[in-house]
C-alpha cells in the first residue's frame, strides 16, 4: 500500500508522483519545471511562522469574518444598481431545490420538463408585466442585457448609432461600450433636463436621425426619477425609423404603466431585486424582451415555448428558439451567451407568483412612500438640497450637500463609523452635480432607520 507524505494531498507521495511523471514522459520534477527560468524561481523554503491546527484556523477566520458588516447589521442607503430587498423564505427554498440549483440549462433540455415549465412561467410573467410579445429565459445581468439590446437594434435596423442618457449608470455604460465597439456601433449621449432630471426632449430630438438604430431610456432612471417624458420617446424614435429601448425596474411595474403600452420595442432590466440577494454585487439576472417577429428572431439566448407531446395528448415544453452560437452556425447566431441565469429566472418566477399583482402593487407603493418620507426628512436639514431634481422619485434620489460643511467623502466615512451606510457619491461620475450623493430606500428601510440617517447628518453638520 502506498504511503502518503501529506494528509490532504495523497498524490504528493513519492510512488504516486513517480507514476505521474512516467505517464507524461518526464524524469523528474526539475525537468517538469525546466521551462521556468531559474532566476524567477523561489530557491528556499517558504517562511511560515504559524502552523495552526484546524481548530485554530477556524477560530482565526471567524475573527476576521466578524469584522464584516452586512445589511442586517446596519441600514444601507447605497443603491445604484444592486438593491437590498426582502427575499421571501419560499423563494430561497425554491432556489435551493436540487431540481433547480444550477444556472445551467441541460443540453437534453426536454427531459427536464419541470425546469422548462418554470422558465416558461418566468417568460410569461415578465411579458405580461412589460406588455411584450416575447421574453427570453434570461441573460447575465441588466448591463449585458442592454448590450444585447443595442446589438439587436443595430441588426434589425442596419444602423450603427445608439443614443443613451447622460444619467446612465457609469458601469452600465462601460459594459455597453464593450458590446458595441467591436460591432462598429457608436454611442452618443443626450442630456437630462437640469431642473427635472428627466429626458431633455429638445436635446434628444436634435440627435435622433436616420443613422440612429435606437434610443435607450430608463424608468426609473439612475437618479431614481419617474420621468413622464419617456412615454413620448418611442414616437420620436419611430418617426425617424429608430427603435425604442426602455430599461425598467420589475417591482416598479406593480404601479407604473408597462413600457409596451407606450410603444417600447425592446425592454431590459436588472432582475436581482426579485430573484436573489445583493451577494456583493452579483451574480444577478438579466431580463430582455421585445415586440414583433423581426425582433423576436434577433433575441439572444433561448426561448422556451409550450407545445404538446408527440401523440398530442399532453402539454409539453421545449426550446423553440436557440440563437446562441453553440447551437447554430456562428455567423447566424445573435449572441455568444453561454450558461445563463436560469436559476435566478426561476427565483423571479417564484417571487412574482408569491406576491401576485396586488402584492406587487403594495410593495411598489410601500417603496414610494418610504422614498418620499426619506426625501422629506433630509430636506429639513440646513444646507442639504433634497431632492436635487423636481420630478417624482422612486427608490432613489439625489441629495446635494453643497451647502454643508466638509466633503461628501468625509460625511460617508462618519456615517459608516456610526453604523449607517450612506449614499453613493456622484462627485466623480457626475461632477456637474457637485457634492451630491444617490440615496436608496426600499421596503427594508424602517422609519427609524431613516430618522437615524437624518439625525446623524444633522449632528455631523454641527460637529
Per-range role (PLM):
Residues 1-16, 20, 314:
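Charged, compositionally biased N-terminal leader segments and the immediate start
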Residues 8-9, 144-316, 399, 409-413, ...:
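Conserved PLP-enzyme active-site core in the AAT-like
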Residues 27-40, 264-269:
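TRNA-binding/sensing appendages of the translation machinery
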Residues 34-121, 328:
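N-terminal entrance/gating region of PLP-dependent enzymes' catalytic architecture
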Residues 97-109, 125-132, 157-158, 182-189, ...:
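Gly-rich Lys/Arg/Thr-decorated short loops/hinges at beta-loop-alpha junctions or inter-strand turns
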Residues 107-111, 115, 127-147:
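Short loop-beta-helix segment that forms the pyridoxal 5′-phosphate
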Residues 274-382, 387-390:
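Active-site C-terminal subdomain of aminotransferase-like
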Residues 358-452:
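Conserved C-terminal alpha-helix-loop-beta "cap" of PLP-dependent enzymes
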